[in-house]
């Protein structure tokens, strides 16, 4: 047998071993109906595994145990092996989105099912298999390299699919207060599109939301001079807002975009001018524009149109995350090399998509990259992931650890 055939045979055996271990742990996690913000015991499973691998595990609870909704208590897991730098941290979430009507699923969403080459379950792609893959990768890595350089950590929350106020952001605040720094962060979100590893996210756009309230004066449609129509007052300003050019983007980010997602007004009667209008819009912005610049330009537009209006406007702003970017460097290179070694793919860097918990970690100075399974079915009925990708992903993750923590 040639050296090439020996290497290929060894790689196939490694993938098979990783695949079964990752599949088994994935199923154990997927059986838990951990609809946000309920972890439902997933982190206990991980803590037990990681403790056996030499990790110090710490549960962090934030929020009100008696509350419901966005202020409910959230369980988070911080696990670390090693006390030196660099620190490579895997960030993930055990919570999942609701299933919708389970009758629409081919297989029960919390009964993991293998069929047609896929593992079907809520959370299969987003993102319990990613957590399982990195856990297996870390176990194998520390078993083979017990004296490795640096440290390996896990930051796992059950508040990523919800309001994200008592999860990763609070854990990061605690770590910062302890001067416990993350050097490299690998977020296990499903980044791949057509094939495993074809895309990794080395940044994300910022997200700035706004709720516009326009207040006029209610009246009869036949007597507009006795009323002030908030719809008419808002229309021109909103039109200019949607047609404005905020920036031209750059090599890493597309131009900043704005989308109006909701407009609501009216009294239910066809002959009444309403008193108020509410509009909801969102900016996805690049590093070429700041939060303050977007707010200032928006207010300038509305101030101009409302200067001579009897109506008044107010905007309530909510920043969900600043844009962040990890330039090509050690972490990006480690990911690209590991992907190439396992799949033969030349990966593409991207900053597209929505926000992730990476937005809370990047401001600490950490390099942040998102790498996970394909995202074709996330948040959908019949969410699924290719079984063959599980072992490959674990092997990629292990390769990243080797690239960063071995001399």
From Swiss-Prot:
Keywords: Amino-acid biosynthesis, Cobalt, Diaminopimelate biosynthesis, Hydrolase, Lysine biosynthesis, Metal-binding, Zinc. The keyword DNA damage does not apply. Coiled coil: none annotated. Pathway: Amino-acid biosynthesis; L-lysine biosynthesis via DAP pathway; LL-2,6-diaminopimelate from (S)-tetrahydrodipicolinate (succinylase route): step 3/3. The keyword S-adenosyl-L-methionine does not apply. Binds 2 Zn(2+) or Co(2+) ions per subunit. GO terms for molecular function: acetylornithine deacetylase activity; cobalt ion binding; succinyl-diaminopimelate desuccinylase activity; zinc ion binding. Its cofactor is Zn(2+); Co(2+). GO terms for biological process: diaminopimelate biosynthetic process; L-arginine biosynthetic process; lysine biosynthetic process via diaminopimelate. HAMAP family: DapE. Catalyzes the hydrolysis of N-succinyl-L,L-diaminopimelic acid (SDAP), forming succinate and LL-2,6-diaminopimelate (DAP), an intermediate involved in the bacterial biosynthesis of lysine and meso-diaminopimelic acid, an essential component of bacterial cell walls. This is Succinyl-diaminopimelate desuccinylase. It comes from Psychrobacter cryohalolentis (strain ATCC BAA-1226 / DSM 17306 / VKM B-2378 / K5). The gene is dapE.
């Amino acid at each position: 047998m040639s050296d090439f055939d020996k290497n290929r045979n060894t790689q196939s055996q490694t993938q098979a071993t990783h695949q079964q271990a990752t599949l088994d742990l994935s199923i154990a996690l997927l059986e838990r109906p951990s609809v946000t913000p309920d972890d439902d015991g997933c982190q206990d499973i991980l803590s037990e595994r990681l403790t056996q691998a030499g990790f110090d595990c710490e549960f962090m609870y934030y929020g009100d145990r008696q509350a419901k909704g966005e202020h409910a208590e959230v369980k988070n897991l911080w696990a670390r092996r090693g006390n030196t730098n660099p620190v490579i941290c895997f960030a993930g979430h055990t919570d999942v989105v609701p299933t919708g009507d389970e009758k629409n699923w081919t297989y029960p969403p919390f009964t993991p099912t293998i069929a047609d080459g896929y593992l079907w379950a809520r959370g299969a792609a987003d993102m319990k298999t990613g957590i399982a893959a990195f856990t297996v990768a870390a176990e194998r890595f520390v078993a083979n390299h017990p004296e490795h350089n640096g440290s390996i950590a896990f930051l796992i929350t059950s508040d990523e699919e919800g309001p994200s106020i008592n999860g990763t952001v609070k854990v990061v605040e605690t770590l910062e207060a302890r001067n416990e720094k993350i050097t490299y962060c690998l977020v296990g979100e499903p980044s791949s599109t057509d094939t495993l590893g074809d895309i990794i996210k080395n940044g994300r756009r910022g997200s700035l939301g706004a709720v516009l309230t326009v207040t006029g004066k209610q009246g009869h449609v036949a007597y507009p001079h006795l009323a002030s129509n908030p719809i008419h007052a808002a229309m021109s300003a909103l039109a200019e807002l949607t047609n404005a050019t905020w920036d031209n983007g750059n090599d890493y980010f597309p131009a900043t975009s704005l989308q109006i997602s909701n407009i609501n007004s009216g009294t239910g009667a066809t002959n009444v001018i309403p008193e108020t209008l509410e509009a909801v819009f969102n900016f996805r912005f690049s590093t070429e524009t700041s939060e303050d610049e977007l707010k200032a330009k928006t207010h300038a537009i509305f101030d101009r149109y409302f200067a001579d209006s009897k109506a008044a406007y107010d905007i309530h702003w909510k920043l969900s995350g600043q844009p962040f970017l990890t330039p090509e460097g050690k972490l990006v290179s480690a990911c690209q090399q590991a992907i190439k070694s396992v799949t033969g793919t030349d990966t593409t860097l991207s900053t597209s998509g929505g926000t992730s918990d990476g937005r809370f970690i990047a401001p600490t100075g950490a390099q942040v990259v998102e790498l996970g399974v394909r995202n074709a079915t996330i948040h959908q009925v019949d969410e699924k992931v290719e079984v063959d990708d599980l072992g490959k992903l674990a092997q990629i993750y292990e390769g990243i650890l080797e690239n960063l923590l071995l001399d």
